[in-house]
Amino acid sequence: MASVEEIRNAQRAKGPATVLAIGTATPDNCLYQSDFADYYFRVTKSEHMTELKKKFNRICDKSMIKKRYIHLTEEMLEEHPNIGAYMAPSLNIRQEIITAEVPKLGKEAALKALKEWGQPKSKITHLVFCTTSGVEMPGADYKLANLLGLEPSVRRVMLYHQGCYAGGTVLRTAKDLAENNAGARVLVVCSEITVVTFRGPSEDALDSLVGQALFGDGSAAVIVGSDPDISIERPLFQLVSAAQTFIPNSAGAIAGNLREVGLTFHLWPNVPTLISENIENCLTKAFDPIGISDWNSLFWIAHPGGPAILDAVEAKVGLDKQKLKATRHILSEYGNMSSACVLFILDEMRKKSLKEGKTTTGEGLDWGVLFGFGPGLTIETVVLHSVGTDSN
C-alpha cells in the first residue's frame, strides 16, 4: 500500500509551470483616441457640457493611447440610452450583453492559444476564467467550457471582479494547479468588456472620466503546464515564483462598486505614487532569492494602468526608457484592458523577441518580472524565466 507521501509525490509535477501558448482577441469595433472626446460626448447626449468636454479632451491627449476596441456601439447606445447616462438604472441590460459576450470573446482568444499549442483540447485538465465584467451562475467559465467543447470533467476556477491586478492572479493560480497536478494543462482566459463601466460624464466624477478615457475591451488566453513534452510542445516562459500583497491603508485608492447603474470606479489621485513607492519592496522580495538587484537586467511586463503610473514606476526604480516599451505599446494600441493586459504584453514580447532575432523570448534576457496593480491596492508579482528562441 502506498503512503500518503508517495501519493503526493506522484501527484506533483517535477518542473516549474511553463507558458506553452498565448492567444489574444478584441471586438471588431475600433475607436481612435483622437476622435473619442467628440464621439463620447455625442453618444452620451452631453455636447452641451463644453468645458467638461475640454477637460476630457486633455485627459485623452495625455493618455498615450492611439486606439481602443470597444464592444459597445453607437447603435447599441441608441437602443439602450440608460447605458450612456451618468447614473440611470441599467444593470439588467448591461448584464444581458456582458454575460453573452464575455465568454464569446474569451473563446476567440482561447481558440488561438489552442491552435498554437497544437494538442487536442481533451488534454485541457483545468480552466481558469477571469473577468471584471458581469456575474452569473453558472459562470462564464461554464459557458466557455461548453463553447469550446471541453471535457465535462475539466476542473474550473472562476474569478470575478478582481480588477486590473488579476492578470497576475490567474498566472499564480495556474502555476499552483500545474505544479501540483502532474500532467495538468491549464487553460487560462481573461475576458473584459467595458459595457459594465461605460457611462456619461459628470462634473462631480472626474475619476470616472479618466476610466472612460483609458479602458478598452479584449481577451487573452494562455496554456500553462509543467514538464512540457518538447517533441510536441513549445515552452515560452517559465513561471518561477508568484506573490500577492496589498498596500496598507489604501483600500479606497482603486475601488469599484456594482450598482443598478453598472460598475462605478473611483480612483485616488495619488495612485501612481502609492504603486511606485511600494514596487521596489516587491521586487526585492521576489529577486533576493535569485541574487538579482539590478532591475534593468530584467525584462518587464507591467500592467499599463495609465501613463502616470508607468512614469512613476520608471522613475522610482531607475528603469531605462526601453524597459516598459512593450507595456507602452499595448497601452497605445489597445488601452487598459484590465486583467487581459499583461497577457497581451507577454504575447507582444515573445513575438517581438523572435522578430528581432533576440536569443530569448524575454528580449534576449533570462529573467523578468510581471506586475499587476489593482483594487486593494493590490500588487501581483510574478517572476519569469525566458526560453531560448532557438527552441521556438
From Swiss-Prot:
Keyword check for NADP: no
GO MF entry, a single one: trihydroxystilbene synthase activity
Binding site for substrate: 55-58, 267, 305-307
One GO location term (cellular component): cytoplasm
Compartment annotation: Cytoplasm
Catalytic activity field: 4-coumaroyl-CoA + 3 malonyl-CoA + 3 H(+) = trans-resveratrol + 4 CO2 + 4 CoA
EC numbers, comma separated: 2.3.1.95
Any one of the GO BP annotations: defense response
Keywords: Acyltransferase, Cytoplasm, Plant defense, Stress response, Transferase
Pathway membership, UniProt: Phytoalexin biosynthesis; 3,4',5-trihydroxystilbene biosynthesis; 3,4',5-trihydroxystilbene from trans-4-coumarate: step 2/2
Catalytic residue positions: 164
Function: Mediates resistance to pathogens which are sensitive to stilbenes.
Subunit (UniProt): Homodimer.
PANTHER family membership: CHALCONE SYNTHASE (PTHR11877:SF14), HYDROXYMETHYLGLUTARYL-COA SYNTHASE (PTHR11877)
Record-stated family: Belongs to the thiolase-like superfamily. Chalcone/stilbene synthases family.
UniProt protein name: Stilbene synthase 4
Organism, as annotated: Vitis vinifera (Grape)
Lineage: Eukaryota, Viridiplantae, Streptophyta, Embryophyta, Tracheophyta
